[in-house]
Amino acid sequence: MIDVAAFIGPYPFRALPHPEPGVLERVLQREGLSGAWVGYLPSPWQRDPAPGNEALFHALEGHSSLRPAPVVRPDWPGWREALDQLVVRGAAAIRAYPMHWGMGPHSPAMRELALACAEAAVPLLLTVRFEDLRQRSALDTAGDLTAAHVRAIARIGAPIKLVVTGAGRELLEETHWGLTPDEQQRVHWDFAWIWGPPEDHLAHLFRTIGAERFVYGTHWPLRLTQNPRANLDLLPAELRARGITDASSLAFSVGKTPT
């Protein structure tokens, strides 16, 4: 099982203990995970994603279980060439942060990025939030990703693979039930921010939208890696047998040339 929502690097708003690839590998082994799609934590707050991407690839050298999930900003010069190069270098997914870049739900730039990712057969990964509003720094002014952003990309119609991390039950249901069945199949969600017992939001969603719509994400080092595993273990017995999707089935092999 792959963790789709892990990060390395310093967090701009508070100190995090050991946000390093070697520590992440040990954490994944402890949790019984085979690898992770890894982002560079400072990147959402940097205008130019290129330096952060280079730092990410450099840091992950020698860590074969950690695959880079770099950032492509579709309003930045040369972004298409950058996307092709990142895919060839082995990017497992492409991250985008429309809320941090001031892009609305129907941004033409985000549409172009989604189409380019579909053409390159690489998942597009969106993050709803990094921290709860109650603990978010006043300097972090970006709002949470909206359901309208997710629906707009899912409705494009191309063979898009969209992975959304950090959503709660409300945003997930607002998005999912506003899509056609075909559009729903283009979106996968992690469940790190979805409540288990006693609210049992995860069990409800497994029953209503299906376990196969979910992938595994920890949001390390911002959140405890034990939370997703505990939520799965605390599901009712009849739901524990329903398997979530392994995100490794959504990404292509390292070094594939984009079509």
What is the role of each PLM region?
Residues 2-13, 17-35, 84, 204, ...:
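Mid-to-C-terminal alpha-helical segments outside catalytic/metal-binding sites
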Residues 93, 106-215:
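Catalytic pocket-lining loop regions of alpha/beta-barrel enzymes
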Residues 13-17, 45-47, 133-145, 229-230:
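Short, flexible/disordered intra-domain loops and linkers
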Residues 23-26, 54-58, 81-85, 111-119, ...:
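Alpha-helical scaffolding segments of alpha/beta enzyme cores, especially the outer helices
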Residues 34, 47-132:
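Active-site gating/metal-coordination segments in enzymes
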Residues 2-4, 37-40, 69-71, 95, ...:
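Active-site neighborhood of phospho(di)ester-bond hydrolases with catalytic His/Asp-centered motifs
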Residues 9-11, 43-46, 75-78, 101, ...:
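Active-site environment of divalent metal-dependent phosphoester hydrolases
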Residues 18-22, 50-53, 76-80, 107, ...:
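Structural motif corresponding to alpha-helix initiation and N-cap regions
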